[in-house]
Curated annotation (Swiss-Prot):
It comes from Calyptrosphaera sphaeroidea. It holds the Pfam family RuBisCO_large_N. GO terms for biological process: reductive pentose-phosphate cycle. Mg(2+) binds at K176, D178, E179. InterPro entries: RuBisCO, RuBisCo_large_chain_AS, RuBisCO_lsu_C, RuBisCO_lsu_C_sf, RuBisCO_lsu_fd_N, RuBisCO_lsu_N_sf, RuBisCO_lsuI. One of its GO terms (cellular component) is chloroplast. Binds 1 Mg(2+) ion per subunit. This is Ribulose bisphosphate carboxylase large chain. The gene is rbcL. Its cofactor is Mg(2+). The basic functional RuBisCO is composed of a large chain homodimer in a 'head-to-tail' conformation. In form I RuBisCO this homodimer is arranged in a barrel-like tetramer with the small subunits forming a tetrameric 'cap' on each end of the 'barrel'. The active site is at K150 (proton acceptor), H268 (proton acceptor).
Length: 459
């Protein structure tokens, strides 16, 4: 319905649709709107018993995708009353439900959404938020530093705790569990939690800084997860962790627990690339960013640009803006098709991890700014002189680059020299620079923005 007048209370969704040969794209868009709201494959007499014109979603615009033959941007508006308040499970059952299996379309991807202000107000938002997290940690004016314990699996509890202690003592703010360490036979969660928190407390006492370790509470049931989170709280942890694969309802449940208990909630995006990486089918990661900010997580892995994982610079900037801005404007090069007022939901901290090292510090600060957690796993634990030396190299590199930036220097072009100068008085940094030099992962991104000169979504 190209004549449909969009309401402020409408939820707007943008789909990238590739219809089957012979299927009209306008008809495909209308079918998507119907199936994701009230319609089925035929006319039913019970339509006469409802306000179908109100509840049926409206496909209001269809545009060809630039440089992509037979692919279309389909804009669909949903009335706010179609969705249960504060329920991500209900929202997603409609928006990414049956329509992704439609035979009439070869491929379908959810690219972006605009959440109405009134609906956003029914979601909790981040349990702690960036501002309060910095106040609790007493750390300002720079990115936070972290590392993932390696190897991910197989360490004993005591050796695991030793890694945590050495990394934090060397200068990191956080250590973390990885996504697939839960409570396996080689190390049950209680053992890991106890030794990890011993390392946290020892390092905090020695350095005088607030330290933390992301204790992964992911489990088979909500009862297991609450039990693990409660144990982490009893041990004095300031932060717990969950994986995206636990599902939207479990994520919201843990976010509410974290708000009640004054805990920071870290989310590892394990599993997202199974549906977010390919350009033609699935959903864009920016939508996951929006949903996770709504659901209430405080941290989410959102890309590094220069690391080993998928990440186009413009797209990642769009992810970071989605997580951090109070109002997001339309920005097509960054893949942001809708303006979004975040209804005062707290900021969610992006996390950069995967194949980064101290020699890239100037690039990381340039691309990602201060409001980020930089996590150097292999870039800490792979240091030839040990874990503590790796942590020290990262901390010295970060502080040298922040000082140079604050002094007004061109830290981007001078970055390598700034690092070399800092390494003159820091042996661990010199060793790291000699080892990793300018290693980076330069591959063509599989998911880049479709730049359109004329904004297609200003409504």
């Amino acid at each position: 319905d190209p004549e449909y007048a969009i309401k402020e209370t409408d939820l707007l969704a943008l789909f990238r649709c590739t219809p089957q040969p012979g299927v009209d794209p306008v008809e495909a868009a209308a079918a998507l709107a119907g199936e994701s709201s009230t319609a089925t494959w035929t006319v039913v007499w019970t339509d006469l018993l409802t306000a179908c014109d109100l509840y049926r979603a409206k496909a209001y615009r269809v545009d060809p995708v630039p440089s992509a033959a037979d692919t279309y941007f389909c804009y669909i508006a949903y009335d706010i009353d179609l969705f249960e308040e504060g329920s991500l499970a209900n929202l997603t059952a409609s928006i990414i439900g049956n329509i992704f299996g439609f035979k009439a379309v070869k491929a379908l991807r959810l690219e972006d959404m605009r959440m109405p202000y009134a609906l956003l107000k029914t979601y909790q938002g981040p349990a702690t938020g960036l501002v309060v997290e910095r106040e609790r940690l007493d750390k300002f004016g720079r990115p936070l530093l972290g590392a993932t314990v390696k190897p991910k699996l197989g360490l004993s509890g005591k050796n695991y705790g030793r890694v945590v202690f050495e990394g934090l003592k060397g200068g990191l703010d956080f250590l973390k569990d990885d996504e697939n360490i839960n409570s396996q036979p080689f190390m049950r969660y209680r053992e890991r939690f106890l030794y990890s928190m011993e390392g946290v407390n020892h390092a905090a006492a020695m350095t005088g800084e607030v330290k933390g370790h992301y204790l992964n509470t992911t489990g088979a049931t909500m009862e297991d997860m609450y039990e693990r989170a409660d144990f982490a709280k009893e041990l004095g942890s300031v932060i717990v962790m969950i994986d995206l694969v636990i599902g939207y309802t479990a994520i919201q449940s843990m976010a509410k627990w974290s708000r009640k208990t004054d805990m920071i909630l870290h989310l590892h995006r394990a599993g997202n690339s199974t549906y977010s990486r390919q350009k033609t089918h699935g959903m864009n990661f920016r939508v996951i960013c929006k949903w996770m900010r709504m659901s209430g997580v405080d941290h989410i892995h959102a890309g590094t640009v220069v690391g080993k994982l998928e990440g186009d610079p413009l797209m990642i900037k769009g992810f970071y803006n989605t997580l951090l801005d109070f109002k997001t404007d339309v920005n097509l090069p960054q893949g942001l098709f809708f303006a979004q007022d975040w209804a005062s939901l707290r900021k969610c901290v992006p996390v950069a991890s995967g194949g980064i090292h101290c020699g890239q510090m100037h690039q990381l600060i340039n691309y990602l700014g201060d409001d980020v957690v930089l996590q150097f796993g292999g870039g800490t634990i792979g240091h030839p002189d040990g874990i503590q030396a790796g942590a020290t190299a990262n901390r010295v590199a970060l502080e040298a680059m922040v000082i140079a930036r604050n002094e007004g220097r061109d830290y981007i072009s001078e970055g390598p020299q700034i690092l070399r100068d800092a390494a003159k008085t820091c042996g661990p940094l010199q060793t790291a620079l000699d080892l990793w030099k300018d290693i980076t992962f330069n591959y063509a991104s599989t998911d880049t923005a479709d730049f359109v000169e004329t904004p297609t979504a200003n409504v």
